[in-house]
């Protein structure tokens, strides 16, 4: 029988159907149409440990709750912010720390979060920046009084909006914005002050998968302490000291 920490052979294993959206470098397609990215690698590694075969399904992020409720997916695993909505799902332990940040054009006069007052900002709909800037984030903070909050179903439209000058700023996960900035024809810079510091986890429907959550948490703990998580985030150019969760501090 398999000992804890050993990886299962990917033969006749039960599927874990994972809902994702395109969110490079976390989840995206390679040239052959395969799902790749930080969260994909982590999910595949965890599933090998706990005895599941991962099946990644792209979902409309704004419809994620409905898809989960209908049973079309087992969980949502795509850099999903748990901060402020801890009671809406059954969550795993957090596996990564993330900053929600704001990016502006390099020559913009905007230098801080306070400077966003009376400005136009773009976000992906149903994300944490959408919740924060619309005042429904579930966390206490002073929200800028925007001229407009423009919500897009696809993150690529958000970037197109700032490129074309339709908005003054965009907000999202720092690692996602930085990935876009690598290839953007328009030079952007990230404001030094974070919009919100958050943690991400894997979300399941309440009271449906307690044993799976327990086993994923055990795998997270193992991968943190054997160095896998640090090596994984480092391979994406991220500092493990900033991104890897210290589980001792979460207890």
Identify the meaning behind each predicted range.
Residues 40, 55-66, 147-164, 198:
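Short helix-initiation/N-cap motifs at beta->coil->alpha
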Residues 20-22, 97-104, 178, 182-221, ...:
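Periplasmic-binding protein-like
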Residues 63-66, 79-88, 132-135, 160-197:
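A ligand-binding cleft/hinge motif common to bilobed small-molecule-binding domains
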Residues 28-31, 43-52, 129-152, 180-185, ...:
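Ligand-binding cleft/hinge of the Venus flytrap
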Residues 13-37:
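Short glycine-rich His-centered loop
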Residues 44, 48, 53-115, 189-194:
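Acidic, polar ligand-binding/catalytic clefts
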Residues 40-49, 107-110, 114-128, 178, ...:
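Extended ligand-binding regions for polar small-molecule ligands
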Residues 52, 60, 92-145, 149, ...:
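A conserved helix-loop-strand patch within extracytoplasmic ligand-binding domains
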């Amino acid at each position: 029988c398999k000992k804890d920490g050993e990886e299962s052979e990917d033969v006749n294993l039960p599927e874990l159907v994972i809902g994702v959206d395109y969110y490079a470098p976390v989840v995206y397609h390679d040239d052959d149409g395969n799902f790749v990215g930080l969260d994909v690698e982590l999910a595949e590694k965890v599933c090998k440990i706990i005895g599941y075969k991962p099946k990644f399904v792209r979902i409309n992020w704004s419809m994620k709750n409905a898809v989960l409720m209908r049973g079309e997916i087992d969980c949502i695993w795509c850099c999903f912010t748990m901060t402020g909505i801890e009671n809406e799902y059954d969550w795993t332990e957090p596996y990564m720390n993330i900053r929600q940040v704001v990016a502006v054009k390099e020559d913009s006069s905007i230098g801080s979060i306070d400077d966003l007052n009376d400005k136009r900002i773009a976000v992906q709909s149903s994300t944490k920046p959408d919740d924060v800037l619309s005042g429904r984030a579930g966390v206490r903070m002073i929200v800028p009084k925007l001229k407009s909050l423009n919500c897009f179903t696809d993150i690529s439209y958000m970037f197109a909006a700032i490129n074309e000058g339709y908005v003054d700023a965009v907000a999202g996960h720092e690692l996602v914005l930085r990935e876009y900035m690598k290839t953007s024809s328009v030079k952007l810079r990230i404001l030094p002050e974070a919009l919100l510091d958050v943690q991400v986890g894997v979300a399941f429907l309440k009271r449906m998968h307690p044993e799976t959550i327990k086993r994923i948490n055990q795998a997270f703990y193992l991968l943190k302490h054997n160095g896998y998580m640090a090596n994984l985030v480092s391979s994406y150019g991220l500092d493990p000291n900033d991104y890897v969760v210290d589980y001792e501090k979460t207890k």
